[in-house]
Regions:
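Short pre-functional
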Residues: 1-7, 97-98
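Conserved tyrosine-mediated DNA breakage-rejoining catalytic core shared by Y-recombinases
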Residues: 4-50
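Short, polar N-cap/turn motifs at the start of nucleic acid-interacting alpha helices
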Residues: 19-21, 85, 104-124
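Conserved beta-strand positions that form and line the central face of beta-propeller blades
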Residues: 23-25, 58, 63, 87-90, ...
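Catalytic-site neighborhood detector that most strongly recognizes the C-terminal catalytic loop/helix
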Residues: 30-32, 113-139
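C-terminal catalytic core of Y-nucleophile DNA break-rejoin enzymes
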Residues: 31-50, 57-77
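Short, basic (Lys/Arg/His-rich) helix/loop patches that form interaction surfaces
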Residues: 57-61, 72-112, 131
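Extended non-membrane alpha-helical scaffolds
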Residues: 142-143
Length: 143
């Protein structure tokens, strides 16, 4: 979720059949489209494929056969281990913020990573800027 900007529900629906090279094929999407493609880093694709092989998951079975509550609890616990409050959707927000801070164009973040139909929805995700970050950008802009 943090690398691909996926929604927790999308992750929980994934099957081995949905993995195609460096892409994930999402069916029955929130947007109402029949299918959507998600581009993922090669390392993530490799780890997913390794996990599927190691656990001998059937091609039409869910890769992560847990409910939303269990996924939420896992993410929350991971956050507690590092001393932060963390929810599944925060990982999606992180993907957008990381891409933005890596100078990925807003249109790519919106249409490819988050798959929003409206750019203004993406801007809500990226609207929170710390004072330190604002000062750094202003200093660099007018240096």
């Amino acid at each position: 979720m943090a690398r691909g900007g996926m929604r927790v529900g999308e992750v929980l629906k994934l099957t081995p059949n949905d993995i195609l090279d460096r892409k994930l094929i999402l069916n029955d999407t929130k947007s109402g489209k029949e299918q959507e493609l998600i581009f993922i880093p090669q390392k993530v694709a490799d780890r997913l494929k390794e996990y599927v092989r190691a656990t001998n998951i059937g091609s039409d079975k869910k890769i992560f056969p847990i409910c939303y509550g269990a996924a939420r609890a896992m993410v929350k616990k991971a956050g507690q281990l590092v001393g932060i409050r963390l929810r599944p959707h925060d990982l999606r927000r992180h993907a957008a913020t990381f891409a933005s801070r890596s100078n990925v164009p807003l249109e790519i973040i919106s249409k490819v990573i988050l798959r929003h139909s409206n750019l203004s929805t993406t801007q809500i995700y990226l609207g929170k800027v710390s004072d330190a970050e604002a000062i750094r950008w202003i200093e660099n802009l007018y240096a």
